[in-house]
């Protein structure tokens, strides 16, 4: 999959507001520490890519994950079950590209409680649209 470089240049002042059925989540985006990831996240949000997507993974004390386009048409019951008949598996969708990793190039990028990070596979350059929020410090994910 081709690596995408966002056009959006973060100012370091970006705040994401994720509206959920439980209320809004506000997150300060670290545009100075992860400009590619923040630029990509902002562009996807501005295009409406995240509209209607559901959080598809919740592991108490670890993470809550969203941003998979495969959840767009899923019902809450299907998301809770972790699957929907006839639909691509949750957690496998992407925007059609991936972005370059930034976690090894900046020591400020750490998984503190409440941190927002991009989900990826074992390939460090495989992040696209999926993200997770840390539910407690997750320093085992820092490398």
Functional labels for PLM-detected ranges:
Residues 1-143:
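Cyclophilin-like peptidyl-prolyl cis-trans isomerases
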């Amino acid at each position: 999959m081709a690596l995408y470089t966002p056009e959006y240049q973060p100012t370091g002042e970006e705040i994401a507001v994720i509206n959920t059925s439980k209320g809004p989540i506000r997150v300060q985006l670290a545009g100075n520490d992860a400009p590619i990831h923040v630029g990509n996240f902002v562009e996807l949000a501005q295009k409406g890519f995240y509209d209607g997507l559901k959080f598809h993974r919740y592991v108490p004390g670890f993470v809550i994950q969203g941003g998979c386009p495969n959840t767009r048409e899923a019902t809450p019951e299907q998301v809770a079950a972790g699957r929907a008949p006839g639909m691509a598996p949750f957690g496998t969708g992407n925007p059609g590209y991936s972005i370059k990793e930034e976690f090894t190039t900046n020591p400020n990028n750490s998984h503190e409680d409440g941190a927002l990070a991009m989900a990826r596979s074992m390939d460090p350059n495989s992040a696209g649209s999926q993200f997770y929020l840390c539910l407690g410090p997750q320093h085992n994910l820092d490398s």
